[in-house]
């Protein structure tokens, strides 16, 4: 149980401190589940606003102004454009506008900086006051409004607005490339940093913007306006440590729109305080407005650690829409009603996770002596709709309250596109907590599930007056509960209460891991003993029963079901003697009706019924009829999901093989040019290798694209005995056909080549020894569930080739050479584990072996016209004498399911061809171009080499 001490006096005592720009400590319950995200935001804050800690010294301690002449004339416009820098520091004015007062104000195209710091107005606008509009745009240097202040004028009376800037027209901050600072500004009444009676627009800025530690005791700790739009900004915007009455950061009388921002928008540690909790003030810890929309933001929106003395720890509003945005998080916020959100009377709230997740965690209300977790509080006639697109979640780790009367049903996933998850979970509430309101959400009105999944997990529960499942899936997990309750208009009776469930799923992994089945409960109405059965409500459970995991997928690939399981408790029913839970059309035997991948087997469900007498001392024992659904599991094998099969894991061996084979074949230049035979030559070669492997039943094909270079140093004796040392390096990408799976590789090959002529060059033999090392990065995509995983392995390849050719001269310019060559290659790769979604482990069980015997004829034609040139044509038949395909064992780590994959069944006969051109540009320099390829019914290869030879 959360034991938060009474806070009213504590925060009332801090109200005075807030007025002077100090921020009260905000109580935090437990470690934020979004800890990593919070750390990233801390780093983002530090890097985005590097000048924050040095603003006081940076702006100086002596009065400075860039301008001479009349700076205070409410009928004239002031335009400050194309200045290198602007300074207005420590200026005092006895009425509006400590530094400047005018009709319309424009600040644009400042190159270096603009400082408005430590200015004081005895009236509105501590730094700038405008009768008309104020625009700050297209500035390249930092813009700093620091420690400006607007004080009430005792002689004229009236309220003051805008600690830094106040205007009666519209206020615009747009297209700035310099970081914007509103820091430590304060005012006696409205808008701690800025206030406008018109529309405030913060739009299209390309630099961060900060509202920090601004205060306004009457409202709008950072800004106050009629309407505010924050849109199209690409860098972070922070509202941090601001303090006001209504709206710790922002207060508007009509709307706030946050839209199309690719940079994050953060509301952190803002506070709404009031001198009295009963005054109706002190609401909206971050935002207080009539209409708030958060739409189409790719960037993250965060409300964290905001506090109010009354309504809505983060937001107090009548109309709220969140849709088509990236992640939106509400964490660690606190209020008296509505830990995160307060929905005022006749409200409409649409929370749709359509391009990112929406999450509520660790939000709290402290209405009673002991604080409790709460996300949303709905007042009378609220219209609340919660939705999520497929692949996204609207998650509540804190309960919601939907208890005041309304004619609008609470709707889960209202639209056809809402096929995602609405999650209620108490996973982050301490195990020791036993305060029911920390776990249970309540609707004393009508509720409907229309699409997608409503998931209740980890001790969370719902109390419904009326719940109807019109579509979608209701999923229950560990210790979850659904109970009946009274009507909001007649809280003393539950007449008419009914829960209708027609498509129930159980989160099997959570049941097996934590051991407590979910419950459907006809709940007694009494709040204290003695408790009695409630004979008014009914629960109707019908349709199939399915098993799912946390991702709303079947669980057979996410847990180990390789062994038999007995007496798995799937569901509990707590009923009354009159049997008001109807299961006549409920079919748990449907567990065996669906086909699936993963572990195969048979479920044997059965009911156990227990009848007792009422024990009225406890609400859990008041009912008399208990039924429990159990099931036994008999495993029958394992069926691999094709998306997890992992054929991609064999491609590093094939890629290593094709690289090595092509290099060994390129050495087959027996009887090279008679143009010149140097003692020493060095070759530099650019390589391109392309391979297409056709798909076969059960295994997809692949394409290899490889580029690299090779270096060779050769020495030849007068007897034409030749030895070469070679080094090659390749950068390769292999893509699986029919998917986005791919392998990126870096291969190196070292080789030794020896060529020996025999019997006065009647024939010649050649030998090649080579070793290759490969570094392979595998990237797998599983499109059905938008998953991806990656891993790295290493390959070792050994190769040897022996060749023999029989050169003979047909004519003086034409040479023909029949040849035969034996190429043996062995390749092996290391074991590895993936990281990412549903990772797998791969273990090499059999290496790759290949023995190929190319044989054919090579013809050379030489010409010395203009420059010595040689053409070589070659045709060969390439039978595979022996091959052992690689075999790799695969284990899906989540379930322990395992299987083997084999490499492609390479066709054993191929036709090879080669074209080679060599031109002697100079006595010591040759250029050559070499193309060789092969084709078979399964595979085609293309190897292109271009290089030069230096002769010594």
From Swiss-Prot:
Its main location: secreted. InterPro entries: Autotransporte_beta, Autotransporte_beta_dom_sf, Polymorphic_membr_middle, POMP_repeat. Disulfide bonds: none annotated. It is found in: Secreted, Cell wall; Cell outer membrane. One of its GO terms (cellular component) is cell outer membrane. SMART domains: Autotransporter (SM00869). It is a peripheral membrane protein. Keywords: Cell outer membrane, Cell wall, Membrane, Secreted, Signal, Transmembrane, Transmembrane beta strand. Residues 646-952 form the Autotransporter domain. Residues 1-27 form the signal peptide. Coiled coil: none annotated. Belongs to the PMP outer membrane protein family. This is Probable outer membrane protein pmp16.
């Amino acid at each position: 149980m959360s034991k938060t001490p009474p806070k009213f006096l504590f925060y009332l005592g801090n109200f005075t401190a807030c007025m002077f720009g100090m921020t009260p400590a905000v109580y935090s319950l437990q470690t934020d589940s979004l800890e990593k995200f919070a750390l990233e935001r801390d780093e983002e804050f530090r890097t985005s606003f590097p000048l924050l800690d040095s603003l006081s010294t940076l702006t100086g301690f002596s009065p400075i102004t860039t301008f001479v002449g009349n700076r205070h004339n409410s009928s004239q416009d002031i335009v400050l454009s194309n200045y290198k820098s602007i300074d207005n520091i420590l200026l005092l004015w006895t009425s509006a506008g400590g530094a400047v007062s005018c009709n319309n104000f424009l600040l644009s195209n400042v190159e270096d900086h603009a400082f408005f710091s430590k200015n004081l107005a005895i009236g509105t606008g501590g730094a700038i006051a405008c009768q008309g509009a104020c625009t700050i745009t297209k500035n390249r240097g930092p813009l700093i409004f620091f420690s400006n202040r607007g004080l009430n004028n005792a002689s004229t009376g009236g309220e003051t607005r805008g600690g830094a800037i106040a205007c009666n027209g519209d206020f615009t901050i747009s297209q700035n490339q310099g970081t914007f600072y509103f820091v430590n500004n304060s005012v006696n009444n409205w808008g701690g940093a800025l206030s406008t009676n018109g529309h405030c627009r913060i739009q299209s800025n390309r630099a961060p913007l900060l509202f920090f530690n601004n205060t306004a005791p009457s409202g709008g700790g950072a800004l106050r306006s009629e309407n505010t739009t924050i849109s199209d900004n690409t860098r972070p915007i922070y509202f941090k440590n601001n303090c006001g009455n209504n709206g710790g950061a922002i207060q508007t009388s009509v709307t706030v729109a946050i839209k199309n921002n690719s940079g994050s928008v953060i509301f952190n540690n803002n506070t709404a305080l009031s001198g009295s909790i009963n005054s109706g003030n002190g609401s909206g810890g971050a935002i207080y407005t009539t209409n708030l929309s958060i739409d189409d933001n790719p960037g993250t929106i965060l409300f964290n650690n905001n506090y109010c003395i009354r309504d809505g720890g983060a937001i107090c509003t009548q109309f709220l829409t969140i849709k088509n945005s990236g992640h939106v998080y509400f964490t660690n916020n606190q209020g008296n009603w509505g830990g995160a959100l307060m929905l005022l009377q006749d409200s409409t709230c649409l929370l749709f996770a359509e391009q990112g997740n929406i999450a509520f965690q660790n939000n709290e209300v402290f209405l009673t002596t002991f604080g409790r977790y709460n996300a949303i509080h709905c007042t009378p006639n609220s219209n609340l709709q919660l939705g999520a697109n497929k692949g996204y979640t609207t998650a509540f780790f804190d309960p919601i309250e939907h208890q005041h009367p309304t004619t609008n049903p609470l709707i889960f996933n209202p639209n056809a596109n809402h096929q995602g998850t609405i999650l209620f979970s108490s996973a982050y509430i301490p195990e020791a907590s036993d305060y029911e309101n920390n776990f249970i959400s309540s609707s004393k009105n009508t509720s409907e599930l229309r699409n997608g999944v409503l998931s209740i997990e980890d001790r969370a529960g719902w109390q419904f007056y009326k719940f109807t499942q019109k579509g979608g899936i209701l999923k229950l997990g560990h210790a979850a509960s659904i109970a009946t309750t009274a009507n909001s208009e007649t809280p003393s009776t539950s007449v008419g209460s009914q829960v209708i469930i027609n498509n129930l799923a159980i989160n099997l992994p959570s049941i097996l891991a934590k051991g407590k089945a979910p419950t459907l409960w006809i709940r007694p109405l009494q709040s204290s003993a003695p408790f009695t059965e409630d004979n008014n409500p009914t629960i109707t459970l019908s349709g199939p029963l399915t098993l799912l995991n946390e991702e709303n997928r079947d669980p057979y690939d996410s847990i180990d079901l390789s062994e038999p399981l007995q007496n798995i408790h799937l569901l509990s029913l707590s009923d009354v003697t009159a049997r008001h839970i109807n299961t006549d059309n409920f079919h748990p035997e449907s567990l065996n009706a669906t086909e699936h991948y993963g572990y195969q087997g048979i479920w044997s469900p059965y009911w156990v019924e227990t009848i007792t007498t009422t024990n009225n001392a406890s609400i859990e024992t008041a009912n008399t009829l208990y039924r429990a659904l159990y099931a036994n599991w008999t495993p029958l094998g394992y069926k691999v999901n094709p998306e997890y099969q992992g054929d991609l894991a064999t491609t590093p061996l094939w890629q290593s093989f094709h690289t090595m084979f092509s290099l060994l074949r390129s050495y087959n230049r027996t009887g090279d040019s008679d143009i010149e035979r140097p003692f020493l030559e060095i070759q530099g070669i650019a390589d391109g290798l392309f391979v297409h492997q056709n798909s076969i039943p059960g295994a997809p094909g692949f394409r290899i694209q490889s580029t690299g270079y090779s270096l060779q140093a050769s020495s030849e004796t007068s007897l034409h005995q030749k030895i070469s040392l070679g080094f090659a390096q390749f950068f390769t990408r292999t893509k699986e056909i029919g998917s986005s799976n791919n392998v990126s590789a870096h291969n190196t090959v070292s080789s030794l080549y020896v060529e020996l002529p025999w019997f006065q060059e009647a024939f010649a033999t050649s030998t090649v020894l080579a070793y290759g090392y490969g570094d392979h990065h595998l990237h797998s995509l599983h499109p059905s569930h938008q998953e991806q995983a990656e891993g790295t392995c290493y390959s070792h390849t050994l190769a040897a080739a022996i060749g023999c050719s029989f050169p003979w001269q047909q004519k003086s310019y034409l040479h023909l050479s029949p040849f035969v060559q034996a190429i043996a290659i062995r390749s092996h790769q290391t074991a590895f584990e993936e990281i990412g979604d549903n990772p797998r482990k791969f273990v090499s069980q059999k290496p790759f072996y290949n023995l190929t015997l190319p044989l054919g004829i090579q013809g050379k034609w030489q010409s010395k016209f203009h420059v010595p040139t040689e053409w070589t044509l070659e045709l060969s038949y390439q039978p595979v004498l022996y091959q052992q395909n690689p075999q790799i064992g695969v284990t899906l780590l989540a379930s322990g399911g395992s299987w083997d994959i084999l490499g492609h069944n390479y066709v054993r006969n191929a036709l090879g061809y080669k074209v080679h051109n060599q031109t002697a540009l100079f006595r010591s320099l040759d250029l050559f171009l070499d193309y060789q390829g092969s084709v078979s019914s399964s595979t085609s290869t293309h190897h292109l080499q271009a290089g030069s030879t230096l002769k010594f």
